[in-house]
């Protein structure tokens, strides 16, 4: 974030997400009070006192750490009122401030033993396994206390660095090391759990490993080369972000603000609480128990079991169910972990950040609009008047049709002709955005020029359907109105449907006729076997131009699949063109008439075409005439 302004929350350049160091995690939650006391560490699993219903000190809802639960009031009640703003109570240590600080002040839990972060260990791909160049199964055996790993071989010739040892194998090696006739001076060092993992990650010199990998990639090929490139890419990213691999092992856990995991009193005097509080409580209980066991120098097997339980508690807090048994609450419902809150359709991003309700938007069912141009869409009047209401009110007042906003709203409710006229002026040249969920690529949102239509359905040009993956069996689309001039310009220049002909993914045309259009084109040009072909010279079925045929169709004198003879001077493609005519006759004036299967040509003495009649169906005339018109309009 830029430091140019004190109100940094409104002035920042970009948001960067990267690994946090243990110091950074503690920095988020730690604060020094004016009396020099450092607060921020949550050490007790309690939430609120069952008698006073006030938060317990140093617990998950502690007022000293997170701020007061009532505005301008400390925990013990010595200071009340806004005039004591900023004072820290000398009795309870709570700062007198607004209660809303409990929505952003964080705490932390200092862990008695390091634990691995489940995202980096069990994610796909597993970054810990890639960095250490070890199989994921082996890394899991270390973290969950099933196997030892060799951290330093010492003087032993039989051991290898990063070799896995079972309990029995390590006991045998220990017996050899401590035997009376042992010649080993430097003992091999082994480790187990997340501490061993942290040591392995600390021992990595990223720059040296990256250099070595580049040399190996140059000489290797196939599957091995792909694996090396994968590892190098991860290492380069760590170097680029100045992150240390050992940060993937946690020494401290952030505790999110209490108002984001609230505890609410219900009518019967019972409490409803967020699942996160239960998950945090498990972590704190196990952490405190582990610290106590280490303090009293408990047997290693008990301490190790407690460390494994702490690792599982932290795994459940970060991503419940990712590994091992899912932690369940009352009535066997899995508890919602931090990952569950963030991810998925109901998660924080898709539901609350991207899926926000926005002003100047609406949604309706889509129907086909065959008379629309490709860059147009039909917008129901009812919807348009609601979406463009501020613009309409502004124009009504400016044109002195009404004097104030209240009168304008009344006029709009009546759906007066004047209002519709003004609405028409407002939407002229004002593009709107149409979006169909799910928006899987950028063509899921496109801009259109609105045309007012009756009814309550949005009309859409059939050619833009493939881009939206839309069909007309009840699909709904959302409408958004770009307000700023810049947004309108961008919509018109970049997002207009007629500018998005090619798919951004493949470069192939995405605007292709499909479904109804293909069926319509086929039906239009199809030949019906029962339709009789008229003889040449049958004046009731002979027309002077394509326009005459269209006029006759409009007047219902002929049907789409009727055969007609029509004069046509353009280029034609005929199956029997390469063969000789069926019949050729020279007239007295020197001109020649050639009979072909589907045409009659009259040629002069030099062989130049004088006139041509072709035998075709009315539907094909319609198709041909439409294409000629469209090509002529664009050229």
From Swiss-Prot:
Known EC number: 2.7.7.6
Note accompanying the cofactor annotation: Binds 1 Mg(2+) ion per subunit. Binds 1 Zn(2+) ion per subunit.
Sites where the protein binds Zn(2+): 74, 76, 89, 92
Signal peptide boundaries: none
GO BP annotations listed: DNA-templated transcription
Keyword Phosphoprotein tagged: no
Transmembrane feature ranges: none
Recorded family membership: Belongs to the RNA polymerase beta' chain family. RpoC1 subfamily.
Record text on subunit structure and interactions: In cyanobacteria the RNAP catalytic core is composed of 2 alpha, 1 beta, 1 beta', 1 gamma and 1 omega subunit. When a sigma factor is associated with the core the holoenzyme is formed, which can initiate transcription.
Stated role: DNA-dependent RNA polymerase catalyzes the transcription of DNA into RNA using the four ribonucleoside triphosphates as substrates.
PANTHER family (alphabetical): DNA-DIRECTED RNA POLYMERASE, DNA-DIRECTED RNA POLYMERASE SUBUNIT BETA
Name the record gives this protein: DNA-directed RNA polymerase subunit gamma
Originating species: Prochlorococcus marinus (strain NATL2A)
Gene name of the record: rpoC1
């Amino acid at each position: 974030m830029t430091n140019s302004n004190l109100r940094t929350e409104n002035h920042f350049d970009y948001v960067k997400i990267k690994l946090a160091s243990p110091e950074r995690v503690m920095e988020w939650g730690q604060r020094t009070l004016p009396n020099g006391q450092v607060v921020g560490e949550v050490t007790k699993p309690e939430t609120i006192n069952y008698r006073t219903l006030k938060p317990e000190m140093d617990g998950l809802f502690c007022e000293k750490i997170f701020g007061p639960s009532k505005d301008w009031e400390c925990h013990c009640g010595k200071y009340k009122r806004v005039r004591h703003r900023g004072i820290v109570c000398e009795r309870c240590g709570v700062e007198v401030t607004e209660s809303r600080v409990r929505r952003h002040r964080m705490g932390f839990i200092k862990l008695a033993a390091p634990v691995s972060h489940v995202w980096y260990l069990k994610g796909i791909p597993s970054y810990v396994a890639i960095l250490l160049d070890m199989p994921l199964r082996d890394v899991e055996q270390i973290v969950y206390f099933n196997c030892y790993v060799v951290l330093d071989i010492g003087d032993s010739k039989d051991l290898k660095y990063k070799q896995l040892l079972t309990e029995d194998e390590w006991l045998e090696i220990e017996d050899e090391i401590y035997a009376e006739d042992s010649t080993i001076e430097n003992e091999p060092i082994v480790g187990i759990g997340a501490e061993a993992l942290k040591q392995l990650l600390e021992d990595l010199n990223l720059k040296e490993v990256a250099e070595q990998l580049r040399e190996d990639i140059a000489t290797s090929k196939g599957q091995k080369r792909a694996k090396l490139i994968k590892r190098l890419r991860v290492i380069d990213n760590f170097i680029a972000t100045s992150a240390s691999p050992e940060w993937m092992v946690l020494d401290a856990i952030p505790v999110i603000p209490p108002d984001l995991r609230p505890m609410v009193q219900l009518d019967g005097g019972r409490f409803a609480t967020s699942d996160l509080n239960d998950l945090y409580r498990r972590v704190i209980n196990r952490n405190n128990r582990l610290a106590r066991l280490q303090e009293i120098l408990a047997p290693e097997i008990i301490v190790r079991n407690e460390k494994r339980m702490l690792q599982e508690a932290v795994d459940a807090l970060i991503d419940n169910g990712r590994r091992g048994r899912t932690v369940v609450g009352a009535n066997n419902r899995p508890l919602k972990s931090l990952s569950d809150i963030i991810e998925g359709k109901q998660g924080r991003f898709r539901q609350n950040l991207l899926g926000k309700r926005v002003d100047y938007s609406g949604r309706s069912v889509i129907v086909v609009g065959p008379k629309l141009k490709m860059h147009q869409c039909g917008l129901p009047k009812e919807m348009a008047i609601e979406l463009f209401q501020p613009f309409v009110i502004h124009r009504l007042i400016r044109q002195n049709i009404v004097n104030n906003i209240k009168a304008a709203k009344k006029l709009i409710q009546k759906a007066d002709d004047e209002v519709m006229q003004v609405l028409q002026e407002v939407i002229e040249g004002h593009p709107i955005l149409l979006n169909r969920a799910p928006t899987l690529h950028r063509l899921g949102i496109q801009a259109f020029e609105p045309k007012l239509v009756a009814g309550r359905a949005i009309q859409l040009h059939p050619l833009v359907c493939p881009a939206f993956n839309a069909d007309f069996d009840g699909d709904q689309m959302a409408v958004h109105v770009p307000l700023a001039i810049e947004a309108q310009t961008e919509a018109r220049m970049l997002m207009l449907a007629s500018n998005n002909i090619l798919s951004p993914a493949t470069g192939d045309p995405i605007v292709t006729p499909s479904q109804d259009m293909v069926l319509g084109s086929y039906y239009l040009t199809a030949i019906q076997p029962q339709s009789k072909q008229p003889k040449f010279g049958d004046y009731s079925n002979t027309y002077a131009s394509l326009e005459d045929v269209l006029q006759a169709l409009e007047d219902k004198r002929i049907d789409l699949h009727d055969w007609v003879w029509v004069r046509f001077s353009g280029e034609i493609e005929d199956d029997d063109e390469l063969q000789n005519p069926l019949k050729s006759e020279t007239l007295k004036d020197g001109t020649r008439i050639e009979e072909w299967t589907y045409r009659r040509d009259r040629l002069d003495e030099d062989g130049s075409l004088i006139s041509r009649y072709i035998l075709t169906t009315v539907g094909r005339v319609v198709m041909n005439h439409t294409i000629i018109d469209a090509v002529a309009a664009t050229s």
